[in-house]
């Protein structure tokens, strides 16, 4: 059976691993997942990520905790296969008054809402992280 929404699967695996207090979570890799993992690392939400390819490419994400609590409080898929969400640079959502980030897929690559606003580009709002 094929996976309908690989990015939602990635976010669910991260959410479930953090609830189970795991240190590392693995999943099938793709260019989009690696780009989202890079943004999460740059923003300080995960400790790191690694791509290994024995037979199939595998993405391993090292989760981050602070004082026993997960750094990621909430991760939510915004644009989904049944209802895509495209926003212009001015209309990009601020997550919790700017405390969280929206991850946006633009024609200049995957970036945060702040970076997209600064570059003056809009795109598909993939997910929000707080």
UniProtKB/Swiss-Prot annotation:
This is Small ribosomal subunit protein uS8. Coiled coil: none annotated. Belongs to the universal ribosomal protein uS8 family. The keyword Ribosomal protein applies. Keywords: Ribonucleoprotein, Ribosomal protein, RNA-binding, rRNA-binding. GO terms for biological process: translation. GO terms for cellular component: ribonucleoprotein complex; ribosome. One of its GO terms (molecular function) is rRNA binding. Gene3D superfamilies: 3.30.1370.30, 3.30.1490.10. PANTHER family: 40S RIBOSOMAL PROTEIN S15A. The keyword Membrane does not apply. One of the primary rRNA binding proteins, it binds directly to 16S rRNA central domain where it helps coordinate assembly of the platform of the 30S subunit. Pfam families: Ribosomal_S8. Part of the 30S ribosomal subunit. Contacts proteins S5 and S12.
């Amino acid at each position: 059976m094929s996976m309908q929404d690989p990015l939602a699967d990635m976010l669910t695996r991260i959410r479930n691993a953090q609830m189970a207090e795991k240190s590392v979570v693995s999943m099938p890799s793709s260019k989009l997942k690696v780009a989202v993992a890079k943004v999460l690392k740059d923003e300080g939400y995960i400790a790191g990520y690694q791509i290994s390819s024995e037979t199939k490419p595998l993405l391993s994400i090292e989760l981050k905790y602070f004082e026993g609590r997960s750094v990621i409080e909430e991760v939510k898929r915004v644009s989904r296969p049944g209802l895509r969400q495209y926003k212009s640079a001015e209309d990009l959502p601020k997550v919790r008054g700017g405390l969280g980030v929206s991850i946006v897929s633009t024609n200049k690559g995957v970036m945060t809402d702040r970076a997209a606003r600064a570059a003056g580009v809009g795109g598909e709002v993939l997910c929000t992280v707080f």
